[in-house]
Amino acid sequence: GEKTKKKIFLKKILDFIAKKNPKSFENNSGINIKTRMDFNRRWGLGSSAILINNLSNYYGLDPFEVSKNVTNSSGADIASTKISKPIIFSNNEKKPYYKEVHFNPPFSKNLLFVYLNKKQSSEKEVEKFKKIRIEDDEIRTISEITNQVLRCKKIDDFNDLIEKHESIISL
């Protein structure tokens, strides 16, 4: 069940940490890991990425490398754990790039987070996404949409840009 999946995932992370940093657990006859979240896990707000980031940092490893080896994540979720503000992210397969950006449009009070109670499996969704061939012109278009969103002053323009973005990336 769900508890078994969590244990397997944690073991996968710890096994990779032990492989990269063999001295990590050498003085421990056993370890006890306790985590706490300030949000409902079912919301899908990056609980796995936060765990990977925190354990990686604790053991002196690069969280992007750990994530790449234990998940099929692009690294955007790891980048999001490092900065508590909006970011832009790209991954050219060599090294993830992320940067904090200013995004506080005049209509920000009209933007909402709506929980639909439809958490998806990140692993499955990433696998599905990786099978799609994305053309270079689509990447350029998405990048331009991102830049327009960051400069956007009107909510109607914002909504149009989000719809345009979704029409490109929707599966």
What are these model-derived regions, one by one?
Residues 1-37, 60-72, 78-171:
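C-terminal nucleotide
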Residues 42-46, 73, 82:
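Short glycine/serine/threonine-biased micro-segments
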Residues 42-63:
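DPxDG-like acidic metal-binding loop motif
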